[in-house]
Structure formats: C-alpha cells, structure tokens
C-alpha cells in the first residue's frame, strides 16, 4: 500500500499542474468570451471539488483493494472458499457504494442548497473537474502499468533473475502499476461517468422541457431512480451474500 500511496501523491501533483492549465482555459472562455463575471470563480471552485471527488474515490478504491487482495490471498492459503469469495465482494461493494453515495450527495447539495443561478456554473465546473481527474488517473495509470511491466522485464533479463523475484524492484512497481490500472482508473472513471451522465440529464431536462413544473418532476424522478438503484444494488448484494454463505459457508 505504501508504494500505491507514493504513486497517488505523485499523481496529485501532476493533477494540480494540469488543472492550472485547464483553469486558464476556463477563465479565457467563460470570463473573456462568455462574460460570466464572478461565476467563473464558482466554476473554478467546483472543478476542484469534482477533481477532488475523482481523486478521493480512487484513493479509497486502491486502499481497499490492496488490503482486500492481501486478505484474499491469505484466505486462499487457509483453504477457505467462502472467505476468498466474500472478501473481494465486500471490498468491491464498499467501493461502489462510496462512489455512488459521494456523487449523489454532491449533486443533491448543488441542486437543493445552492441558489438556482449558481447551480449551472457549479455543475459545469463539477463536470469539468471530475472528467479531468478521471481521464488523468485512467490514462496515467495505464501508462504507468506498461512502463513498470517493461522495466521489470528488462531487469529480469539483465540480471538473470526469475519473473517475480523480490530482489527486482520493478516487480513491486509492476504490482503498483496493476493496482493503478485496475483500481485507480476504474474507480475514478466510475465516479466521472456517473456524475457526467447526471449533469447531461439535468441539462437535457432544463433545455428540452419548457414547463417548470414538468422540469421539477423530471429532476426529482432522475434522483429518485438513482437512489432506488443504489438501494436495489445493496439489497441484491445482501441476497447474493446470503445464498453464497448458505451454500459455501461451511465448506
């Protein structure tokens, strides 16, 4: 986990550098071309919130997955089929529930707490930020995986050591890269996808439906369906967990 943490800290520095360039583009477009005035500050603030959301979910995901991988490996050594099934399921469900819950909370906060004239800029900034974070974490994670893999193979050939020899530091980097590519990227990507589709639906409703009463009804419907989906996923997990435990818990 320490190597994964080091990777994420480096990613955070790169994200802030990239955000500085995107922030400059936002200021030029929304302030100088669209003349949105002080609302540009709201867009910039919520772009940071969206980016922090993607990064936070990715950090949580890699932390849970790293420890879950270790515990699953030890459970398999004990010959426990139920534990080797239950630990990954619980960790995956935990990440999914946190991801969706954080996203829903942030979007509902924008919709219900902030003034209506600020909601639009907030959603614009939020969508930009989470897309930036997810794209960077997804792409950079994949690139890091490939570089670490190639580096480990080169050291293996140069020093005539085995595939996963602990003396090869590239092996540890490769494991970190696998976690980065298979955990950090999908977690941030899921957060971004869920948020951007929500913003797109809200934009479509406000732009395509002229009647304000119907707009409110449709917006409420969007969030009710999302909450129901969250509850249904959790109930499905509990049912699956109960059935699996009844069948394999005593094996």
Each model region followed by its residue ranges:
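Hydrophobic, small-residue-rich transmembrane alpha-helices and their short perimembrane loops
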Residues: 1-251
